[in-house]
Amino acid sequence: MGMPVRLGTMAMVGALALGAMTGTLGCKKLLKGRGNKGTSTTTTPTATAKNTNTPQDDADEAMQEKLDGYIICLNTLSSPVHATRSRYFSWVNPKTGPTGQERVVLGLFDLPNDKVAKCTSGLAKSKALPPKDAKLEAAGDDFARTVTDLDVIIDEVFTYYENKNFKDDKFAKGKAIHPRLIAAFSAFSKADNNLHSTLDGITKPLSQRALARIEREEGKKFRFHRKHVLLTARELVEAGDPVGEDDNVDFALYNASFGELDRALTDLQSYGLLHKNDLDAQTNPAWPLAKSNFDQFNRAAEDYRKKAREYLRCLRDAPPKARSANGKVDPDKIGPCNDGRPRDVVQKYNDFIHTSNDHQFP
């Protein structure tokens, strides 16, 4: 499965997508996607290849199974938490808290019902699966603890503002609970970034090995090109929405990443023109939908490439005030750009990942 992305400073980006394990882990601020399908078909080798498994193949398959719970949890909760945080900060100064003088009181969003409990349960199950990975498991534990603590506070704050209780106590509770809410948001953000980073360190090499395995067992056919497009798409969206304190965009990296996606997608399209009849073979696991699924995958990938190219122009033509000496570009200082916005790139990436997860073609 693929993993959508979170949008950083611009909005909410989607999610990691299970395919992320196999090559579509998401970015930072929006965690895009919510339940994605197709995990097994993304990376699982064909039945005839099972007897050729190397010890590394077996280890990778075990790790992929272990990662599912971690990725599902991130996809389910990271984006909603960032959304409710943005909602709250849209009308409250995070440093001072509510003053009671606000013209508009929006409160915040509640988290999805029972999602935190399901998430933490899934993390516990994944933790028990082999192989042991102390860093991953510690990151998962920290994520579970901080999101559970945050959920309790969010429920309390949501009810307070939803029922307009601030009209009765003149914002007394809103002012009192603000420091706790900020501390909980901060703790979660650290845990969220840490789990993202930890998963990133595992899934990227795992994805590269999966791609090499496909080439070893099948050659550069549809499965290889599909996987390659997903991998390069992930690298590009991450280059355009960096995680961490320095979230300025490295133009050289984004430009190179776009070139990789451009070539990978062109290779898939070229192969498809020559071998599209192979998709109609009844031996294809996705038959009789393979050809239609290929077309939908290709359209979604093309839409993503178009938006990514438009954003590339914005970065390339950024005004001097948005550029730093190290070649990075601050998206917040670019100003209006008719060619594209970072949130559009992330949205198209998330759309692409959802399409990919739902439209397997082999």
Residue ranges and their predicted role:
Residues 178-304:
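Extended amphipathic alpha-helical interaction segments
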Residues 57-175:
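N-terminal Sec/ER secretory leader and immediately downstream segment
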Residues 1-12:
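Bacterial N-terminal signal peptides that target proteins for export
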Residues 84-98, 126-133, 154-168, 202, ...:
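Secondary-structure edge/capping motif, primarily at the C-terminal ends of alpha-helices
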Residues 38-105, 175, 209-245, 358-362:
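Immediate post-signal-peptide N-terminus of mature secreted/exported proteins
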Residues 256-362:
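A cross-kingdom marker for long, charged
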Residues 11-22:
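Bacterial N-terminal signal peptides
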Residues 25-30:
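Bacterial signal peptide processing site
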